[in-house]
């Protein structure tokens, strides 16, 4: 009699799944962590809510109202979740029938869209971006049949550029009555003028993902948002966990979204943008750097000579970057988070010493 292993009992798509390679999962023994697009220094908060004997609100009122005011939308258009990553998954769970519907995304881009779909058993379709990393609208149009959710990251991770707003409008017209278009705005605080939040009234099928992990310097909090029209939010509320935010998370999130918290965030953005421009200028003068791409974010994508050797050399010196070689069209590319001036200098000095 054949023995059935525990793995044999698992769903086939889970057995075949490659988990998302997060920065922490990839590890390393660094002291300069520039691989996860985090804010480089600690922002201090004090807990004010001590009612830990009680379950929290499903959608904490102070968090929802503060975020709605910050984003310029109505509270009914906001859903808070465990990071934007949960928002990615909720949209698939609410709109895609496993084994029947598909999602579509445009690589090179963020890796969680495919992981979330594959976990749920939903087909992934890809339409690689054009040479300038803008949308291939004809390619998308050709593949839309059976697609229920389209993910577009803008500014795009890992390339750092904004998607042309006219292309977004064309995509929203192409998908009207057919699919939800999800604009992933995890990095929008670094270029707030480009947000699509003002478009919600025009497009009932638009959803926008946001996070406190980047400019708000709270990656360890795991708090993100979905902005959408009330009909979409109500559907997501059917599939979200009953208590997605713990009481301490809601407490700190509400503080971060207070008027003082918003001012502090904008000061951090100004500082990071100045540091980004310093690092870009320095990288352009280094011999092992072939090309530095423009960025609207808190990270820089650059193409290197012998990028694997450079990546390993810096890794061995405790400087952890993000290797993008496996992404379509990113051969030779490494992504560098903008950190402190001291961290930038460590990177610059290490790269100048490379004999490539």
Curated annotation (Swiss-Prot):
Q: Copy the pathway line from the protein's UniProt record.
A: Amino-acid biosynthesis; L-histidine biosynthesis; L-histidine from 5-phospho-alpha-D-ribose 1-diphosphate: step 7/9
Keyword field contains Transferase: yes
Q: Which UniProt keywords apply?
A: Amino-acid biosynthesis, Aminotransferase, Histidine biosynthesis, Pyridoxal phosphate, Transferase
Q: Which GO terms describe its molecular function?
A: histidinol-phosphate transaminase activity; pyridoxal phosphate binding
* Swiss-Prot/TrEMBL cofactor(s): pyridoxal 5'-phosphate
Q: Which CDD domains match?
A: AAT_like
Query: If you read the UniProt record, what top EC class would you report for this enzyme, in one word?
Result: transferase
Which residues does the record list as N6-(pyridoxal phosphate)lysine (modified residue)? 214
Which Pfam family, giving just one, matches this sequence? Aminotran_1_2
- Its recorded name reads Histidinol-phosphate aminotransferase
Q: Identify the species of origin.
A: Escherichia coli O81 (strain ED1a)
């Amino acid at each position: 009699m054949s023995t059935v292993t525990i793995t044999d009992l698992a769903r086939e798509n889970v057995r075949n799944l490659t988990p998302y390679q997060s920065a922490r999962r990839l590890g390393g023994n660094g002291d300069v962590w520039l691989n996860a697009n985090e804010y480089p220094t600690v922002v201090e908060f004090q807990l004010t809510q001590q009612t830990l004997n009680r379950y929290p609100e499903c959608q904490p009122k102070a968090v929802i109202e503060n975020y709605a005011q910050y984003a310029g939308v109505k509270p009914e258009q906001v859903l808070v979740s465990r990071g934007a990553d949960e928002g990615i998954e909720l949209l698939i769970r609410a709109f895609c029938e496993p084994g029947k519907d598909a999602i579509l995304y445009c690589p090179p881009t963020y890796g969680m869209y495919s992981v979330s779909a594959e976990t749920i058993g939903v087909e992934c379709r890809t339409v690689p971006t054009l040479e300038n990393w803008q949308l291939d609208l004809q390619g998308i149009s050709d593949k839309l049949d059976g697609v229920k959710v389209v993910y577009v990251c803008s500014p795009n991770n890992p390339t750092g550029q904004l998607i042309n707003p006219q292309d977004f409008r064309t995509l929203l017209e192409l998908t009207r009555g057919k699919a939800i278009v999800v604009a992933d705005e995890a990095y929008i605080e670094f270029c707030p003028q480009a947000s699509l939040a003002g478009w919600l009234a025009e497009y009932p099928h638009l959803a926008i993902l946001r996070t406190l992990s980047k400019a708000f310097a709270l990656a360890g909090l795991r708090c993100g948002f979905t902005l959408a029209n009330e009909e979409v939010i109500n559907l997501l509320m059917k599939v979200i966990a009953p208590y997605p935010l713990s009481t301490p998370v809601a407490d700190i999130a509400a503080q971060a979204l207070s008027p003082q918290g918003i001012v502090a965030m904008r000061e951090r953005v100004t500082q990071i943008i100045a540091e980004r421009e310093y690092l870009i200028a320095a990288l352009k003068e280094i011999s092992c750097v072939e090309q530095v791409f423009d960025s609207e974010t808190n990270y820089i994508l650059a193409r290197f000579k012998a990028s694997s050797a450079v990546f390993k050399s810096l890794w061995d010196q405790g400087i952890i970057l993000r290797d993008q070689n496996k992404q379509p069209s990113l051969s030779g590319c490494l992504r560098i988070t903008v950190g402190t001036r001291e961290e930038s200098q460590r990177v610059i000095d290490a790269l100048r010493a490379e004999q490539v």
